[in-house]
Amino acid sequence: MLIHPEEILETIHMIKAENFDIRTVTMGINLRGCCHSDIDVFNKNIYNKITGYAKELVRTTEEVQNLYGIPITNKRIAVTPIAIVAESCNTEDYVSIAKTLDRAAEDVGIDFIGGFSALVHKGITPGDMKLINSIPQALASTKKVCASINVATTKAGINMDAVAMMGHIVKKTAEATKDADGIGCAKLVIFANAPEDNPFMAGAFHGIGEPDCVINVGVSGPGVVNSAVRELKDPDLGEISEAIKKTAFKITRMGEMVGREVSRRLNVDFGVLDLSLAPTPEIGDSVAAILEAMGLETCGTHGTTAALALLNDAVKKGGSMASSYVGGLSGAFIPVSEDAGMIRAVELGALSLEKLEAMTSVCSVGLDMIAIPGDTSAATISAIIADEMAIGMINKKTTAVRLIPAPGKKVGDSVEFGGLLGRAPVMKVSEFSSEKFIARGGRIPAPIQALTN
């Protein structure tokens, strides 16, 4: 393939000036063969399986990073949902399992490990219940473990008993990590239609239909897309879409190249490339900045949802041409604390929780990294989750909620997490009650569009 000098310079510019990086190389590992009734034996089995497969992951990704000169920000692991593989264990809680995952992650040198997870969209098994009840202590006593719970699908509807439970779990997790502004909640996500091959945290787990070991890659390039849009001379929206498509193709192609080389060197399957635009707290490396480059005064004003729909669609169209295997979440992320433009919009009063909810109907993945007052009730948190699950269920898409009820904080305050997690201004929630609705429980039935056979 002929590569022109200007293409090489363009790639260098993306990395040096526009914050382009491979956000994550995530290794998925199957733990189903590790099951045992003795919790100590089970913990030993999963530790050996994870460290056996992942011992060369960090070294290999760093070699590939040096080979191509493309930064790889995070190395991560996703495992089979622990609620499934630990159900046979004779134990009352799974905190020791979370600590084993954390130790394995530490020993192989990765950034995060996902899969402290349960799939409860149609009902809750004893193993699911043990895992859910273990989440607050598990996340408080570990550094790298991430938890996720799938409570809804388009085919099954919404398990409102699980939704009600998760409101309390989010509150307890915030309280258990109150010394760090409730950071445990940044490692807990509640899903509708959770994908089995998502490389991004906190929602990554290794699905039941996956191979024994696989490499999935997530890219990041809002700064590159932002620059591409701003360089256009008085474009119409069709021309903006075309520019985003071309840029997404280039970004995705680099991710594909890196992912395949890592998987080749590790001798494991290449799974998927996740096309998602993942922002960082860096100025300009922002999804909100792209929307403002299209002509909005600030993210959150009228027209924001339409601009985001254009962006999300163009990213998918361009990215899908660059990879044979696209998967995961694949869209544009709107995590408030991780996006400098979103933070600014909230502080200006332009971006509300209700507007963010509308935006989630046209992008991936949901209400993400949003700080709310610490005294918000569990029922209100559950109701916010239920609203977001309904959007996912009806629209046949992945949606999620990652809320931080910041202990001791009120509207106007902010919480500082640092690093990629950034800073979150505390946002207003409705002062009116949803408690009676949430207390009814049961299941919201699957919609008519679930009947596809």
From Swiss-Prot:
SUPFAM superfamilies: PFL-like glycyl radical enzymes. It holds the Pfam family DUF711. Gene3D superfamilies: 3.20.70.20. InterPro entries: UPF0210. It comes from the Archaea. PANTHER family: UPF0210 PROTEIN MJ1665, UPF0210 PROTEIN SPR0218. Belongs to the UPF0210 family. This is UPF0210 protein Mbur_0828. It comes from Methanococcoides burtonii (strain DSM 6242 / NBRC 107633 / OCM 468 / ACE-M). The lineage of its organism: Archaea, Methanobacteriati, Methanobacteriota, Stenosarchaea group, Methanomicrobia.
